[in-house]
Design a protein with these regions (language model features):
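Extracellular/periplasmic carbohydrate-active domains that bind, remodel
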Residues: 1-420
Length: 420
């Protein structure tokens, strides 16, 4: 697949055939508000007070030189080549013939389009509501949702089978398949799914609260003898549905992934967490809206034993943490020993939710986290670092600056402390 990720000399960029999205760390000496100049082939292309910039109306398959400067000199420079223009695979056209009426379930048609998608092709969703069950993506592919297009997961648990190896609340286990599944979980290995783009102006949504309730009810029945025999364990959990609730799927599950770019979309109503990346590297999420109002454990963006994960210019309306930085729980997370590090969160806004959190699952360690220019005033927690007494692990090198926060909390919590 033509490369869409570039990182060099202090700058990182993602590109399409006609655009480049560029970002950089805020300089240590910068004030709360600074102006940056972006030069494209030695000519000023943009002035911005943000630490990111998108340049559009570029030429496909063209090499550009980028340079960012501010009052104290250079931020960095980067040479980048835009991708070729991709051929569109319209999901409504033959041989897929998906129906965007909000009623027909298109799982087979959409999976065929995904399976057919090559590295120089793009799966295209025109406006419409495309109902589906679980879908499995592969390396070197792109989904593009046009404005008004909704990829809508059903609320039927049967549509999220088979169960897959996953990790929830710090423990590896079998969970329902997510709406979108990228990669296969393996804590002993590197990436097995790479170079995937999810972008556009549309929405990727799942069954939300109703799907969660149905899965929990089914799992509660399946585990009724175990729950009855382990009443003491159940009493130490957050609530009676904690254990049966752990098999719920995420909205987008990224296991052992690398070079994943999510841009411009609305992600909504996973049955638990929305965007979950575990044992993954180089995940970029920008200019997205994440919604999970009323969903229990409805986290927005969760890097978990992952590295080089960046989110910026995003809005959150979540039923739990907007961002939750994790790395496993209790002995298992410590033994697996895959820390989360090199995390960047900037220019993000909370309209509802719990804010930005590190933990409580962090026994694999968390380090090198930088957060700046975020508004978490409308959140219940603001910034929270939380652990339990038996976690182990570490949290270090966390830098937070130029943010509006409702609270700052560093504390021990008494829930979610069971584990292998």
């Amino acid at each position: 697949m033509p490369n869409h990720f570039f990182s060099q000399n202090g700058l990182t960029a993602c590109c399409t055939d006609t655009s480049i999205t560029l970002f950089w760390d805020k300089p240590a000496a910068a004030g709360a508000v600074e102006t940056y100049t972006v030069l494209l082939d030695d000519a000023a292309a943009a002035h911005t007070q943000k630490t990111h910039c998108t340049l559009e109306n570029l030429r496909p398959e063209t090499t550009y030189s980028l340079f960012v400067q501010w009052r104290s000199g250079s931020i960095g420079e980067l040479t980048i080549r835009t991708t070729p223009t991709k051929r569109c695979l319209d999901v409504t056209a033959s041989p897929y013939s998906a129906v965007g009426d909000g009623k027909a379930v298109n799982t087979a048609a959409l999976q065929k389009a995904i399976d057919d998608c090559g590295e120089r092709e793009q799966i295209y969703f025109p406006a419409g509501v495309y109902c589906t069950g679980t879908l499995r993506l592969h390396s070197n592919m792109e989904l593009y949702l046009e404005e008004g297009a909704v990829l809508q997961g059903t609320a039927d648990p049967e549509d999220y089978l088979p169960r897959i190896s996953s990790r929830f609340e710090g423990t590896e286990m079998e969970c329902y398949s997510s709406l979108l599944n990228l990669g296969t979980l393996d804590h002993t290995a590197g990436p097995n799914c790479e170079n995937v783009i999810l972008r556009g102006k549309g929405t990727i949504a799942s069954g939300g609260k109703l799907l969660a309730e149905r899965i929990i009810a089914s799992e509660r029945e399946r585990l009724k003898d175990y729950l009855a025999q382990n009443a003491t364990l159940v009493s130490t959990c957050e609530n009676a549905d904690t254990i049966p609730g752990r098999v719920r799927p995420r909205l987008v599950n990224m296991s052992n992934c690398r070079n994943i770019w999510m841009e411009g979309l609305t992600f909504a109503n996973g049955a638990s967490w929305n965007l979950h990346m575990v044992y993954s590297d180089q995940i970029v999420t920008d200019h997205c809206t994440i919604r999970s109002d009323g969903v229990w454990n409805g986290d927005g963006w969760d890097p978990d034993s992952s590295t080089n994960c960046t989110i910026f210019a995003c809005e959150f309306f979540t039923g739990d943490d907007a961002v939750a930085i994790k790395s496993g729980k209790n002995p298992e997370g410590n033994i697996i020993d895959r820390p989360t590090k090199h995390i960047r969160v900037f220019d993000c806004h909370s309209g509802f939710g719990h804010g930005i959190c590190i933990g409580s699952e962090m026994s694999g360690g968390v380090e090198d986290v930088k957060i700046w220019d975020c508004d978490m005033a409308v959140s219940t927690s603001g910034l929270e670092i939380k652990v339990t007494k038996k976690r182990g692990g570490y949290v270090r090198n966390v830098e937070v600056r130029d943010c509006t926060l409702s609270h700052v909390m560093v504390h021990s919590v008494g829930y979610n402390d069971d584990g292998i």
